[in-house]
């Protein structure tokens, strides 16, 4: 099923596999379109188990990765990109070291100086997810600012966000999850020309419902997707379970 909510296009699939493949096919088509117009594109990736399906599908496709600069949207303070619980490590394992990117820019290598890399390389494609609390990157409710003047900032993670990392199997207990992270800001994220948001699993059903039904405010940061003219949301049956069966 496909429908529009404000400017956001929503696709719902029965399975995660179908969802991931469809998102990957759309991302691949977008990459090829952009590379027909210029020599290099800039892509930003999310690091979370919710992205496994789409990344796996992208890896199965013959794409011109050598024309792509890769970025990611957040990183825990105090972790190096080689640390197994870092987002840099996740992305190395799932895409960054699997294909020949032109360049890969890690948040852990720059900290807040990542802003200069972002300024010099405007995003063409943003591949993201939505957190259980409606966050995008680590822009949690209370941290997100739709008018943020910064490109990247230091964020204190809320309890729901930290508990999600346990639910995702990234950390054994709540207390093991770092309290602080670097995150791209909301304006930096929505500056991308195209946004492909992949959100599977029953744990995200409330977040998907809220994204599509609450007012567009920073109390549910993902609602900002509804204001972007080239934003696409991909759900499976579980994450879409609280939506009407017909729209």
Q: Which functions belong to the PLM regions below?
A:
Residues 45-50, 128-132, 200:
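Glycine-rich beta-strand-to-loop/alpha-helix junction loops that act as flexible
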């Amino acid at each position: 099923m496909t429908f529009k909510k404000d400017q956001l296009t929503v696709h719902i699939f029965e399975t995660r596999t179908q969802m991931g493949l469809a998102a990957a096919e759309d991302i691949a088509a977008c990459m090829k379109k952009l590379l027909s117009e210029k020599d290099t594109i800039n892509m930003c990736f999310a690091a979370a188990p919710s992205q496994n399906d789409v990344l796996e599908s992208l890896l199965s496709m013959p794409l011109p990765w050598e024309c792509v600069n890769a970025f990611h949207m957040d990183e825990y303070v105090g972790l190096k990109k080689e640390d197994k619980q870092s987002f840099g490590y996740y992305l190395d394992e799932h895409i960054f070291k699997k294909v020949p990117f032109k360049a890969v820019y890690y948040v852990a290598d720059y900290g807040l100086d990542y802003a200069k890399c972002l300024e010099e390389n405007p995003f063409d494609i943003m591949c993201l997810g939505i957190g259980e609390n409606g966050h995008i990157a680590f822009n949690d409710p209370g941290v997100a600012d739709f008018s943020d003047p910064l490109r990247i900032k230091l964020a204190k993670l809320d309890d729901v966000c930290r508990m999600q990392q346990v639910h995702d199997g990234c950390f054994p207990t709540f207390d093991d999850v770092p309290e602080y992270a670097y995150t791209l800001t909301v304006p930096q994220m929505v500056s991308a020309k195209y946004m492909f948001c992949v959100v599977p699993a029953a744990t995200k059903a409330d977040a998907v419902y809220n994204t599509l039904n609450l007012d567009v405010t920073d109390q549910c940061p993902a609602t900002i997707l509804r204001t972007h003219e080239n934003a696409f949301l991909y759900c499976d049956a579980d994450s879409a379970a609280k939506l009407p069966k017909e729209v």
